[in-house]
Amino acid sequence: MEKLSKDFFGNEVLICGCSDKDNLYYKRLNKAFLSNGITVYPMPTTPESELGFKTYKSYTDLPIIPKCAYILSYKSKTSEIIDELSGLGVNKIAFYGNACVDDEILHKCDSLGIETRLGCPMMLFASGFCWIHAKIAGVKR
């Protein structure tokens, strides 16, 4: 699998699995994408989530379906999300980390023709600890 890069996201990204459990992270993530010219379409795991910015309750609420998605859910939900995204024409998916994905899920994506990456986009866009994490992980910014 190739390393995550800014180009992977293109101009827009659908974020699946964001919740109000870690509100600060999602606010920073949203800001980081927007600051880099990437339009964000967040879909919380619970529609009642109040993240402090616009979210979408379902795929039908989205004004467009981005070709790229970023998944922040547990493995138990990821496979179902991939089925939905594949049916909507999403062809690139980045996963937050190992809690979201395993080899079986990656093979499923491959069989569906979905390009995948693993890693937190904050390593690409943020500073401070995220910048240090990017250096350790070998992520080129």
Residue locations for each model-derived region?
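Hydrophobic, well-ordered beta-alpha structural blocks that scaffold small-molecule cofactor pockets
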Residues: 1-51
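A short helix->loop->beta-strand "cap" motif at the edges of active sites that frequently abuts
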Residues: 36-38, 88-92, 112-115
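Mobile, glycine- and charge-enriched loop segments
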Residues: 46-74
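Short acidic, glycine/proline-enriched helix-loop-strand junctions
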Residues: 50, 63-65, 101-126
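N-terminal glycine-rich "phosphate-gripper" loop used for MgATP/nucleotide binding
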Residues: 70-78, 95-100
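ADP-ribose/adenylate-binding Rossmann-like module
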Residues: 85-109
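A charged, well-structured terminal subsegment
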Residues: 126-141
